[in-house]
Amino acid sequence: MKSKIVGVIAIVLVFALDQVSKAYAIDWYSQSGATEIFKFCSLVEVWNRGISFGMFGALESSNLIFTYVSLGVILMLFVLFVQSKCNKSTICMGVVIGGALGNLADRLRFGAVYDFVSLHAGEFHWPAFNFADVCVTCGVICFLCLEIMYHAKACVDTSGDPDALSVKKY
């Protein structure tokens, strides 16, 4: 139960930080325009109507389609979140859900996701992203690492405590 509370806190915290960071970036951009923060990092303004890297953004009704897809994914993740018996996985899912909700809020409010961080080196430019994107990516990576470490190695619960998993020796 404690992990569910921590997971819910992660959802709320990630969502809130994402929305605050976007509000700050929108305000900054409206006053200062694109700004170089470091030699390799700039504050920019990109309204992403598609999915990752702006794919399918030109698709007619893309916002409506991706809003429904986002809702479906969030609902599926929430079901997994509620059913999860692994405390660490619950927290990872909370981070992913919080980020997904942040981007969904943009779609509902603006009709697109607001991206504002641009990483670049010379002629190389990574597509713009936001705090929610970072949280979704990190949460998924952490979740996959947990799956590989615990489940792919045939973990067993010896104590009834989801955090006390031990690896089966073959």
UniProtKB/Swiss-Prot annotation:
Disulfide bonds: none annotated. Pathway: Protein modification; lipoprotein biosynthesis (signal peptide cleavage). It catalyses: Release of signal peptides from bacterial membrane prolipoproteins. Hydrolyzes -Xaa-Yaa-Zaa-|-(S,diacylglyceryl)Cys-, in which Xaa is hydrophobic (preferably Leu), and Yaa (Ala or Ser) and Zaa (Gly or Ala) have small, neutral side chains. PANTHER family: LIPOPROTEIN SIGNAL PEPTIDASE. This protein specifically catalyzes the removal of signal peptides from prolipoproteins. NCBIfam families: lspA (TIGR00077), PRK14775.1 (NF011357). This is Lipoprotein signal peptidase. The gene is lspA.
